[in-house]
């Protein structure tokens, strides 16, 4: 891993030295106050999971109101610019939420019987920028395939550490960072996941208007190493149609003693590893988009993420909905259809439907060998409407309605998730102050 980190650092240094060939972001800075921004996002969210064939009380539902804020100064002028910012959130539950869960509400105790009534979290960060390279230190929301913050619940997952992002070469982004704290969406303590230290590095490059690629790596102390790669090719077919191919995948190796869900591994092995990859083809014509995706997982472990402070959204693969279709040995196939209903007189409204089917899941379970099988199955039928106001005083307000119907084999339900009908309703109201 050290060789990869040194290579990334060398690329950052070389990119800085040749930055004169590309316009400088820092030279365009207007000032500490002049470029300052401040905004608030009001989010009302509801998630309900109706679980089948379970004991009374095992269903989970959560209803929460959150206020997320972000304020950031502009960069000071000069060769090296400095900026500061704060990020945070305040939330309160709506109703008793006695059976809450789903990473929505933190709990007062370990037996998950007493959810918080209200809670607040947050942090600060500082940035330094030279040319087109920015160093950020402090509390951050990460969008890195191998270390990605969960942003699909009420409030984001926060990481604390240092991240360098460089755009010194046109169409190339290079990153390198070190993080020492991880706070998930439903956690109060800033390092409740006990992250020791995680190094990340990587790059993405746009070769031309049709072809792009990326690679990212993660080395988390006493936990795991992970690599991710992606290649995307878009083939124009006509003025309003195209065909896009995408190949992506992860290779992960876990250290001995790393955390794991019982559904994810063969407990007879002390060396856990996994390869998971996906190939998709997406056809677009006007407002219509159809995607066909195949995904496959191999190794003595499933693709396990989030258990080791490695980001609860670190699965940049197409077959991820309520289930991620990432079981041990699993193969899955998805058919998805999306339509932009703006073309039919309703600007801002879209509809997505998808069906995913997974098979050949190895369900060996710790102390539960009666459920051993190599051909368990799962399926999910997904539907979502999303509407975003396009103009007027409410411009940017969005409403998302999502429903999933999930079913699986009894052997997989025993160690993963029972048959479940899930409903999600999220209303987002963004407010920009300056």
Where are these regions (language model features)?
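Residues that define the transmembrane beta-barrel architecture of outer-membrane proteins
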Residues: 34, 61-67, 118-122, 156-160, ...
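Residues on the lipid-exposed face of transmembrane beta-strands in outer-membrane beta-barrel proteins
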Residues: 40, 67-73, 124-128, 162-166, ...
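C-terminal structural cap/anchor segments
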Residues: 299-376, 380-383
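Outer-membrane beta-barrel translocator domains and adjoining extracellular loop/strand segments
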Residues: 51-56, 95-100, 146-154, 185-193, ...
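Beta-barrel outer-membrane channel/assembly domains of diderm bacteria
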Residues: 2, 12-139, 339, 384-390, ...
């Amino acid at each position: 891993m050290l060789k990869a980190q040194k290579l990334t650092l060398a690329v950052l240094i070389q990119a800085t030295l040749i930055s004169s060939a590309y316009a400088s972001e820092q030279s365009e800075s207007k000032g500490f106050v002049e470029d300052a921004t401040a905004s608030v996002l009001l989010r009302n969210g509801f998630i309900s999971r109706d679980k089948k064939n379970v004991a009374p009380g095992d269903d989970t539902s959560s209803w929460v109101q959150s206020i997320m804020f972000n304020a950031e100064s502009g960069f000071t002028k000069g060769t090296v610019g400095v900026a500061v910012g704060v990020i945070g959130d305040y939330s309160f539950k709506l109703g008793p939420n006695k059976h809450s869960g789903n990473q929505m509400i933190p709990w007062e105790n370990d037996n998950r019987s007493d959810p918080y009534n209200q809670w607040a979290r947050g942090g600060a960060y500082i940035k330094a920028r030279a040319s087109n390279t920015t160093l950020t230190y402090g509390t951050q929301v990460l969008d890195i395939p191998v270390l990605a913050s969960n942003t699909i619940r009420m409030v984001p997952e926060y990481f604390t550490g240092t991240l360098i992002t460089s755009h010194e070469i046109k169409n190339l982004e290079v990153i390198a960072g070190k993080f020492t704290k991880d706070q998930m969406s439903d956690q109060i303590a800033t390092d409740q996941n006990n992250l020791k230290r995680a190094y990340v590095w990587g790059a993405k490059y746009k070769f031309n208007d049709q072809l792009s690629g990326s690679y990212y790596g993660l080395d988390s102390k006493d936990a795991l190493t992970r690599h991710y790669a992606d290649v995307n090719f878009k083939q124009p077919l006509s003025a309003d149609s195209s065909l896009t191919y995408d190949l992506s995948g992860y290779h992960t190796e876990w250290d001995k003693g790393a955390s794991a869900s019982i559904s994810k591994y063969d407990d007879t092995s002390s060396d856990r590893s996994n390869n998971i990859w996906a190939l998709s083809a997406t056809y677009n014509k006007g407002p219509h988009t159809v995607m066909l995706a195949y995904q496959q997982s191999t190794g003595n472990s499933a693709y396990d993420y989030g258990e080791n402070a490695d980001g609860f959204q670190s699965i940049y693969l197409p077959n991820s909905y309520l289930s991620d279709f990432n079981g041990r040995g699993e193969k899955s196939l998805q058919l998805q259809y999306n339509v932009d209903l703006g073309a039919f007189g309703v600007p801002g409204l879209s509809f997505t439907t998808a069906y995913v089917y997974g098979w050949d899941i190895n369900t060996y379970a710790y102390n539960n060998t009666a459920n051993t099988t190599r051909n368990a199955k799962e399926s999910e039928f997904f539907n979502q409407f999303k509407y975003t106001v396009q103009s007027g005083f409410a411009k940017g307000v969005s409403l998302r309605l999502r429903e999933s119907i999930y079913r699986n084999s009894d052997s997989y339900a025993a160690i993963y998730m029972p048959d479940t009908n899930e409903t999600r309703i999220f209303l987002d109201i963004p407010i920009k102050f300056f």
